[in-house]
Amino acid sequence: MHGLLLAAGLLSLPLHVLAHPQPSTSTSLAGRAGAVDLNEFRVAHRSSYTSHDEMKKLPSIASFRQGTYLEVATELVKQTMPNMEFRLVDDHYVGDSGIGHVRFRQTMHGIDIDNSDFNVNVGKDGKILSHGNSFYTGPAPASNPMVKRDFIDPMQALNGVRKALNLPVKANGAHVENMSEHKVMFKGTSGALSDPTAKLCYMAKEDGSLALTWRVETDIGDNWLLSYMDAKESSKVHNVVDYVAHATFQVYKWGLADPTEGKRDILTNPWNLKTSPLTWLADGKTNFTATRGNNAIAQYNPDGGNDYENNYRPSPKNLKFEYPYSPDMNPPKTYIDASVTQLFYTSNVCHDLYYMLGFNEKAGNFQVNNRGQGGKGNDYVILNAQDGSGTNNANFATPPDGQPGRMRAYIWTRANPPRDASFEAGTIIHEYTHGLSNRLCGGPANSRCLNALESGGMGEGWGDFYATAVRLKPNDTRKTNYVKGGWVNNSPKGVRMYPYSTDMNVNPLVYTSNNKLNEVHAIGTVWCTMLYEVLWNLIDKHGKNDGPVPVFENGVPNDGKYLAMKLVMDGMAIQPCNPNFVQARDAILDADMNLTKGANKCEIWKGFAKRGLGVGAKFDPKNRTGSNQVPNECK
């Protein structure tokens, strides 16, 4: 679950329930008494990434036989990891940039190694563009654990997780139902929003060994956890992943970051029929008269509960979603219709824009009805306005494709009267982008690939980057600075360490700043700062389209702003599971190589190098090495 800040009690593992309060050094469970710090259970960085430039140095790749992108990808894994057992993950697709994305999961004795993945990117020419790899290469277990059933039963695992993490789940009288050979469901529990499950799997550990675990899944609202309990010791949790990282419409239209930037307008049929052909108010089976449709369902959620379908949502006559609102109105519930409408509008525009840039059905986007275009449906975004489960934050939960995303927008109490997160577009875009990055990085079927500290930080940085790119104004230049979350937080400094700026005197952050940072929002500020440099380099080269949608020429946005947004998005799908900054940088360069044949290589390199992520920069979680160097051809 990801939130805007670092709400007291959230962690930014793969879900996305983080928001944007001032950075905190603590990320614990839901802020409850006795809460456990989930940072202690983060997944370690294990991925390698072989970029396009590195691939060209491997002559053996050129001898690959021609075939489908699946066959080419499978052959690469077989040659790279001979004699290893793996399976094809059923979420492969060809993106709108022509790249075939194929992912494999390593297995041992027929059991998944849950954090051992191999992703292959096949270019439009049928050749390998790049690949990422986190396969386990240590000693294999001597015997198949399924033969002697040499592990604790799943109920012991659930109880062990409950105790170790102090979860509000009760299992007295609960029983186990088999779902498959390695997976069970717990029936009769209380305290979770859905029945917990457990799956037997291995986890590759930092010390190079392999642990047999029960992956216990518990959705408790503000945290949606995958807890890897040792299958032989019911008191030992190895890792934890959190999925939550916390008509006419009268709205602040797209591009206005908050109520200080303009007035509300009445917009007629604001949807884009190319990306939402069913409109925002239908799902192909039902035409709705409330804030519900194929992409999202928005409602008032004052008690913070999970029964969203029966909650109140505006349903006006003649589809006129026109309601009074002023930032001076109080209490917030007096303008709930306007709040739900604004949240519904902003999230749907996000859906439509991201669809145009490549986040479509095959890529794992959020829709009930995918209209036969690939991917898994039945997963609109659940949008809870004025959610009563918290304050001063917002969050987004991103389970795998086919399960609904969930956004919670809270009331912020740092102003008088309080301010509603639904009206700060930057907050909503940031949260929706958690859904984007979690579905693309690792593939639609795996929402566990932004769990390490640096990759989790990039998840926050991408949210800020897209929110900032969207709010750019016609007269902005590279000298324009922007803060994040200034309005909701009632602070001119916003909720980040520094404004986003290309001026080193205003924002001095560089790659090695991460050596002193241990919180995802702080690390995300470094990442977004780098992307802001790249953004302006591309705008200075290609100009800036100030319209609400990109204009494409041969599949490439013809301006720098949308080109940057496109390349960053393509990079998310190319990079390995749990990437670091260096790997994510290389993935963006490879995205440009695929899309434009590397026409923007130097603009990208110079943006990263200015902030210490140049040629020669190296990742070490405790001692990163910075570099301001660019390739010789860019000097």
UniProtKB/Swiss-Prot annotation:
Where is the catalytic site? 431
Provide a GO CC annotation, any one. extracellular region
Subcellular localization is given as: Secreted
- Carbohydrate-modified residues are 287, 475, 594, 623
InterPro entries attached here?
A: FTP_domain (IPR011096), Fungal_virulence_M36 (IPR050371), Peptidase_M36 (IPR001842), Peptidase_M4/M1_CTD_sf (IPR027268)
Q: Name one GO molecular function term.
A: zinc ion binding
Work out whether the entry's keyword set contains Membrane. no
The protein's Enzyme Commission number: 3.4.24.-
Q: Which cofactor does it need?
A: Zn(2+)
Q: Which residues form the signal peptide?
A: 1-19
- Manner of cofactor binding, per the entry note: Binds 1 zinc ion per subunit.
Residues engaged in binding Zn(2+): 430, 434
Coarse class of the protein's main subcellular location: secreted
Q: Which UniProt keywords apply?
A: Glycoprotein, Hydrolase, Metal-binding, Metalloprotease, Protease, Secreted, Signal, Virulence, Zinc, Zymogen
- Pro-peptide residues, renumbered to this chain, are 20-246
Enzyme class, spelled out? hydrolase
Q: Please, one GO biological process term?
A: proteolysis
* Assigned protein family: Belongs to the peptidase M36 family.
Q: What does this gene product do? A: Secreted metalloproteinase probably acting as a virulence factor.
From the Swiss-Prot or TrEMBL record, give the protein name: Extracellular metalloproteinase 1
User: What organism does this protein naturally occur in?
Assistant: Trichophyton tonsurans
Source lineage: Eukaryota, Fungi, Dikarya, Ascomycota, Pezizomycotina
What is the gene called? MEP1
